[in-house]
């Protein structure tokens, strides 16, 4: 799965005579399209509140866009995933420009490190970390230092001549 979007899905049980206005359930779901977002919504609603698609309805579904998509932010992501040995809870920190990009990075990372597939990963919560002091993970902390510089170890100078009698040396 790739190119996720964030959807807000609001649904409820079908109204009955005993409960004319049922309680609304809202979820923020990351999916590639509305169909998958609805499907995941019903999957989680059945697990959490015992409401099936046949006995419920979706009131609204909206795509959520990032407020500042060019600003780099730190995100904390709480995840529950099923592995070959059982179910695990996990907290990861991701540095990215948007919630959706952070979740895409998370799915790639979980696939690479833990061989976890999309179907076995449940994102519980995604929160932006406002203060740099609240960042816990070293792999994110290393990018928060002031005056961060990246070395350019193998620089190649532009050759002045079109033709040369020897190969250029690129090690200085």
Swiss-Prot record:
GO cellular component terms attached to this protein's record: cytosol; cytosolic large ribosomal subunit
GO molecular function per UniProt:
structural constituent of ribosome
Question: For this chain's UniProt record, which GO biological process terms are given?
Answer: cytoplasmic translation
The Swiss-Prot or TrEMBL record describes its family as follows: Belongs to the eukaryotic ribosomal protein eL20 family.
Q: Share what the entry says about its subunit structure, partners included.
A: Component of the large ribosomal subunit (LSU). Mature yeast ribosomes consist of a small (40S) and a large (60S) subunit. The 40S small subunit contains 1 molecule of ribosomal RNA (18S rRNA) and 33 different proteins (encoded by 57 genes). The large 60S subunit contains 3 rRNA molecules (25S, 5.8S and 5S rRNA) and 46 different proteins (encoded by 81 genes). eL20 forms multiple interactions with RNA and proteins in the central protuberance, connecting components of core functional centers that are located far apart.
More info: Present with 54300 molecules/cell in log phase SD medium. There are 2 genes for eL20 in yeast.
- Do you know which HAMAP family this protein is assigned to? Ribosomal_eL20 (MF_00273)
The protein in question is named Large ribosomal subunit protein eL20A
Per the UniProt record, the source organism is Saccharomyces cerevisiae (strain ATCC 204508 / S288c)
In the UniProt record, what gene is named as encoding this protein? RPL20A
